[in-house]
Amino acid sequence: MIRSELIQKIADENPHLTQRHVERIVNTVFEEIIEALARGDRVELRGFGAFSVKARDARVGRNPRTGEAVEVEDKKVPFFKTGKLLRDRLNTK
């Protein structure tokens, strides 16, 4: 599912909201998650999961084409840990 499909699904299930309103809401939610992570905050959506930022140390990597050693700088990467409800839902038979 892509963002536009999510917006359409929410709009279909909430006829009192226009698609433009739903799009603004969805974009605001994503933007707030991104801003919180940029500040280093953790974002928890109970049952669904939690977004956080992890630091990766600098390291020596390899260019897959040439095999040459390449310095990879330290960086921050987003991390998502699934919530119990999501895990249970995915593993029901």
Curated annotation (Swiss-Prot):
GO terms for molecular function: DNA binding; structural constituent of chromatin. SMART domains: BHL. Coiled coil: none annotated. The keyword DNA-binding applies. Keywords: DNA recombination, DNA-binding, Transcription, Transcription regulation, Translation regulation. PROSITE patterns: HISTONE_LIKE (PS00045). The keyword Transcription applies. Belongs to the bacterial histone-like protein family. Heterodimer of an alpha and a beta chain. This protein is one of the two subunits of integration host factor, a specific DNA-binding protein that functions in genetic recombination as well as in transcriptional and translational control. This is Integration host factor subunit beta. It comes from Cereibacter sphaeroides (strain ATCC 17029 / ATH 2.4.9). The gene is ihfB.
